[in-house]
Amino acid sequence: MKDQNIPFEGAIRWGYAFNQWKLGWQGFARLDDNIRALKVTSAGGFRCIELTAGTGPWDPLGRPESIAQHFGSVRRFAAQLEDWGIARIPGVFFDPGQLSFEEGHFGLCATTRADHALIRQQAGVHARFVAEVGGEYLVIQPFPPYWRSGELSAAALEAVADLINAIAHDSQSLGLDTFIHLDALSSLRSAEQIDSLLGQCPSPGVGLAFDTAELTIAGHDVVALYRRFHRRVRHFHFKDALAVDTLEEYRLPNAERALILAGGRREIPRWFGELGTGRVDFKGLLAAMHELEYRGWVIVESDRGPQPVASSILLNSWYVQHVLRPLQHRPNPAA
């Protein structure tokens, strides 16, 4: 029988994001639901899981304290992963703009220097967890949405760069890399701003996490953008984009709800889709990754996909196994 497991070793290491199971901080709170989700993801062929930083008792796998409470310790949890078909947790995604009961805030802002100490403290909690389970990286989404902060000033960009450098310094002491994630609503909008940010974060331990759908929705050509920044792209989130924000509705108040959830003026029913169903040129991107010798993690996502979540995982698994992985072994994957 053919091995259905998707490789997590080699030049491209495949994994899956756990965030699609939990839509809202109070949802998907039962421990047994989370364990079933790990089993379903493994059954789909993905044996590595990127966790998302969470908060409170409603998120059993969102904090190391919660994990220790449920499993006795972080190490016991890591040792038990194989029982559910999961080989490893390579990293955690951390958005300081989300509320945290443990740190006592309703969202912090990386452009505000007064928030830096607490963001750094919170990042350290998750970085130490990643190190303890044998992972490799922390992904941070540092920029606030445009509708909250407006145009990104040079001073604000410098503040974010200083915070990233501080977090990267802490993470490197644990043997981890730090990857910067940009989303469709981010106050950082242009390639020139990315250039400026990277110039202020020169450490080899700092890289970009390219989210194919988020960047496409924001109006970027992901393949061209990857070619421009390939030396610093160290991580990918693979998901498809079903539309582009051509009306610049990222400026709308509460754009997370007004645009992403409600669809904006065009009433887009769904922004994110399974691989191969939308606007992202995955074949062209894989060709560029092959040509430019990308080595690192590719984490597939089902962000806000339809219920049941398992169907998106299986469709993405099919696309990876039958379309993308065969292209990895061709001299010209785009052909």
Question: In which residue ranges do the predicted regions lie?
Answer:
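N-terminal pre-domain/capping segments
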Residues: 1-136, 165, 207, 287, ...
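Conserved beta-strand positions in the central sheet of alpha/beta enzyme cores
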Residues: 50, 90, 139, 179, ...
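Histidine/acidic residue-rich metal-binding segments in metalloenzymes
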Residues: 161-169, 201
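Active-site groove signature of glycoside hydrolases
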Residues: 129-151, 174-183, 299-300
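Histidine-acidic metal/acid-base catalytic patches
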Residues: 1-45, 128, 191-206, 210, ...
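Active-site cleft segment of glycoside hydrolase catalytic domains centered on the general acid/base Glu
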Residues: 145-164
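Active-site-proximal loop/turn and secondary-structure-junction residues that shape catalytic pockets
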Residues: 20-22, 53-55, 94-98, 142-146, ...
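Basic- and aromatic-lined ligand-binding clefts that recognize polyanionic substrates
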Residues: 173-202
